[in-house]
Amino acid sequence: MRQGMQRFWSWMAVNLGRHAGLVGLIGLIFTLVLGFGITRLEFATGQDSYLNSDDVVYQDNVQYQELFGGQALLTVVATEGGATVDSLFTPEGIATFTKVADRARAVEGVRGVISPLTALQFSNSLIQPPAGGTVFDAIATKSLVQAKEAATAAGDAASIEARDADLVTTSTRLLAIPQDQQVLTNPEYVKFLLYDNEGGIRKALKPFFPDDTHALMITRLDGNLSIEAEGVAADGAVAAAKELVIPGTQVTTTGASLLLQDINDYLKGGMLTLGGIAVAVMAAILILFFNVRWRLLPLAVVLIGVIWAFGLAGYLGIPLTLVTIAGLPVMLGIGVDYAIQMHSRIEEEVIIDHSPHPIQEAARGLGPALLVVTFDAVFAFLAIQLSKVPMVRDFGWLLTVGIIAICVSSIVNPLAALGIREFRSPTKGRNFSEGRLGRLVVWLGSLPAGAAIPLAVVSIAVFVGGSIVEPSIKLETDPTNWVSQDNPIIKDLRSVADQIGGDAELGVFVKSTDGQTLFTQPVVDYVDEFTDRELAANPDVLLNATSIVATISDLTDIPGAKPVAPEAATVQSAWDVAPADIQTSTASPDGTALNIIYLTKPGSLEDRARAVTSIRDDANPPQGTELVPSGLAVVGTGLLENLEGNLVQLTWLAVGLVFLFLLVRLRSLTRALLSMVPVLVASGLATIAIFALGIELSPMTAVGGPLVVATCTEFTSLILLRYIEERRRGLEPRAAIDITASRTGRAFIVSAMTAIAGVAVISTSSLPLLRNFGLFVAIKVAIALLAALVVLPPLILWADRRNWVSKGMLDGEDAPFIDVADHADSANALS
C-alpha cells in the first residue's frame, strides 16, 4: 500500500511538471468552466435561511404573513413649537396624508397603509350612525351602552356611576358640535375624536397617536418577501413618506426591513471587500516573510482554488447567505497554508537536501499529509451540518467544497509550475532552516519531554476554566447593535423608539381550527382578556396592542369602571365599517383569523424570546381555535434559539469527527490524541481570553468552533506527520522534532500569519456582527497555532520515548523514484 501510494505521487509529480503547458491549458479551461458556476450563485435572503421549512415557527410565520402581510415601516410625525396632533388635520394636512398614503399603496410590494388620517376616519365611522339611524345606532354608542348594561347586570355600582358620568360628558361634547359639522376638517370635531374626557389621547387611538405631539403611519409590506424584494418595496415606501411634508413637523421613517436590507447590501459587497483586504494583507505577508522564488505563487494558487470553490457552489446549488461573507477570507486564510507548505517543501528538497528527485520527494512527503489535513477540515466543517440554522449549514457546505477545491489546486498547480521551473532553472540559495523563522519555531518547541505532564495538567485546567467561564460570555442579541451605531437607519430606529416608546412589532394571531368564524362571544372575550394579560405580564417588552377587538374594548375603557369585553356582534360591525387597510391587518375576510399586533419596546432578541414564551405558555385559547405568535420578532427569537441550541455541540462534534478520522487514518489512539490536545488547550485559553477582554460574541460565532478545530488540527497533523517522516529517516526523537521545526518553521509561521490575517480581516468590518466574530476566531486561531507549536513537541517526545508515536510507522521499504531523462544539467530537478 505504502509503495503504491509513493508510486502514485511520483507519477503525479513527474507528469505534472513534464506536461506543465498542457496542465496549464487544461487548468485554464477547467477554471473557466467552474468559474461560470459563479454566475449561478444565488443569495438566499428569505426566512428559509433562518428557519427550517419544517419548523412550526416557520410554517406559522408563512401563514401569518399570507393572512396579514409582512414587515411594517413606521413613519413618525412629530409636531414642533408646542403644537399638538390635532393641528395636523387641516385641509392641507388631510390632502397630504391622502396623497402620501395613496402613493405608498401604489408601490409594488406594499400591502396597505394606515395613516393617522385612516385611524381618525375609522374612529369617525364608529361615532357616526348608519344612514337613516340615530346616534344610539352608532357602534361607539352601542358599545358604551352595552358596557353599562354589563355593569348593571353585575351590580357594580362604582362602574355604573363612572360609566354614566362618562356617557353624559361624551354626549355633551359630541352634541355641542352640529351634525353637519362633524367632519374631519372641523378642528373641534377632530379634538373630540382624538381626546378623551380627561384630555388625553383616547386609548383606542394610542397605537397611532402615542401622545399629543406624535402621530404614526404604518406601511405594511407584502408577506413572505425576500430581503431584496422587501428592500425594494421599503425604498418605494420611504420615497413616498418623504412627501409627507407638513409645516411645523419633523418626519422620521424607519423599520426592520430597512435595517435587514442595509445589512444584506453590506454583506453582498462586503464579501468581496473583505476578501480583497485579505488578499492584500496576505500578499504583504508573503513578500515580507516568505523568502522563496515566486513568493506570491501560493496566493495565486489559493485564488484559483477559491474560484473553483465558488463555481462548484453555484453548480451544486449552495446558496450564499448572510453568514457566507466570512467564507472568502476564511478560505483564503486557511487554504493558502496548503500552497505555502507545498512551495516551501519543494524548495527545501532542492536547497537543503539537494535531492536528485526534489519534486517527487516533496509530493511523496507532503501530498499524503495535505490529504490528511484536508479531511481534518472536511470533517470539522461537516459538523456544522448539525446546526439548526439553514444558512449556517449552507456555510458549512461552502467551506467543505471550498477546502477540497483548494487542496486540489494546492497540489496540482505548485507541482506543475514549480516542476517545470526547477527543470529549467533550478533554485539556488542558502539553508533557510537556520533563518529567524526556523529558529523561532525550534525555540517554541524546545520544551523537554519532562514538561509534558505539567503541560497536560495545565491544559486540562485551562480547558476546564474555559468551560466554566464560557456561559458568562455575553452573546449580543440586540439586532440594532449588530451594525454601526453611526448608521442612519440605526439613528432613525433609536429616534423613533425615543419618540413613541417602541420600534418593532410582535404579531399574534388566533385562527379557527374548524373553519368557523371567530366573531363569536367566547373568542372575543378571550382575545380581549389575553391582550391585556400579556401587556401586564411583559411590561418591559410590550408597549401597546392593536386589534379589532382591542379597538372596541378600548372605547369602553373608562377610569373607575371595571373593564368589559365588547359584544361579538359589535366587533363584527366595527370591522365591517373599518377602512380596507385596517380590515386586512386585523382579520381575514372570512373571519377565521384575528390579528393582535403588539408594539415592542427596544430590546434584545432574548427579551422578546421571553415574551414569546410567555405568550405561548399562557395561550389556552377556546376550543376550536389556536393562538400563534408570529412575525419578525418570532422569526428572530427562533433564529436565536436555533443558534444557541447547539452552539457548544458543534465544536464538540467537530472535535469528535476529526478525532475519529485521525484514529482511523493514523492507526493509533496516541497519535490521534496528540493531534487534538492543542485544540482543547486553544479552546479553553481563548475562551478565558475573550471573557477577560470583555468581547461580546455575535450570533455568527456558531461557526467559530469548527473553524478553529479545522485550522488547529491542520497544523498539528502536519507537525506530527512530518515528525514521523523524519523518524522514518532514522533520526532520534529530539533531532526529529528539531529538524521538523527548523525546516518547516518558515512555512508554519507564514501560514500562521496568513491564516490569522484571513479571519482577522473580518474584524475590520464596520458591522459589530462581523467584527466581533473576526476577533473571536482570530484569537482562537492564534492561540491554537501557538499551542500546536509549543505544547505538541514535548508531548510527542514524551509519548515517543514510550514508542507510542512511531510504533508501526517506521517499517517498510520505499518505492524507487521515477527516473527522468536529462535536460541540460538540470534534468533531475524536474523529478
Locate the predicted segments by residue.
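Extracytoplasmic
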Residues: 66, 156-292, 525, 538, ...
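Alpha-helical transmembrane helix bundles of large polytopic membrane transport and channel proteins
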Residues: 99-208, 214, 250, 539-577
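Hydrophobic transmembrane alpha-helices
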Residues: 286, 302-303, 319-340, 382, ...
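Solvent-exposed, non-transmembrane loop/terminal regulatory segments of multi-pass membrane proteins
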Residues: 23, 38-88, 94-95, 99, ...
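Pore- and gate-forming transmembrane helices of large, multi-pass membrane proteins
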Residues: 271-273, 299, 338, 351-387, ...
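Hydrophobic, glycine/alanine-rich multi-pass transmembrane helices and their short helix-loop junctions
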Residues: 285, 371-413, 418-421, 659-662, ...
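Interfacial segments of transmembrane alpha-helices in multi-pass membrane proteins
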Residues: 269-320, 386-390, 650-698, 764
